[in-house]
Amino acid sequence: MLQPKRTKFRKVHKGRNTGLAQRGNKVSFGEFGLKATGRGRITARQIEAARRTMTRRIKRGGKIWIRIFPDKPITKKPLEVRMGKGKGPVEYWVAEIEPGRMLYEMEGVSEELAREAFTLAAAKLPVATTFVTRTVM
């Protein structure tokens, strides 16, 4: 599963997820992309589940790029522990997703197959997504 090798701080504040994606919002590597239209958090497990689904669907052909990385630690206190006594240990890692963010990219497959694979992957993700193709400038 994806997570940072090392971080400056072990735990972070909750923060707020606002605004639109200013970076990582175009198809940069492949021909087709899965773009977020909603806002939310995607865990490392969800990123991996969607990747495995796409890989199974396209079989040997094509290449997949993961354009997001879970770099925010989410903490959780153990069950039946009283309030206070500090922040709990890190439970899992998430990527904060803003509308417009490119989640995955793919090339080397037909548009029909890419669309199918992204539809299957989107079912594993907690944010609304859309299929996009590369626009040549």
From Swiss-Prot:
Disulfide pattern: none
Keyword annotations from UniProtKB, A to Z: Ribonucleoprotein, Ribosomal protein, RNA-binding, rRNA-binding, tRNA-binding
InterPro entries per UniProt: Ribosomal_uL16, Ribosomal_uL16_bact-type, Ribosomal_uL16_CS, Ribosomal_uL16_dom, Ribosomal_uL16_sf
GO annotations of cellular component type: cytosolic large ribosomal subunit
Entry-linked CDD domains: Ribosomal_L16_L10e (cd01433)
Single Gene Ontology BP annotation: translation
Top-rank taxon: Bacteria
GO molecular function annotation: rRNA binding; structural constituent of ribosome; tRNA binding
PROSITE patterns for the chain: RIBOSOMAL_L16_1 (PS00586), RIBOSOMAL_L16_2 (PS00701)
Pfam families: Ribosomal_L16
PANTHER family given in the database record: 50S/60S RIBOSOMAL PROTEIN L16, LARGE RIBOSOMAL SUBUNIT PROTEIN UL16M
Subunit structure as annotated in this protein's UniProt entry: Part of the 50S ribosomal subunit.
Function as written in the Swiss-Prot or TrEMBL entry: Binds 23S rRNA and is also seen to make contacts with the A and possibly P site tRNAs.
Family per record: Belongs to the universal ribosomal protein uL16 family.
Protein name in UniProt: Large ribosomal subunit protein uL16
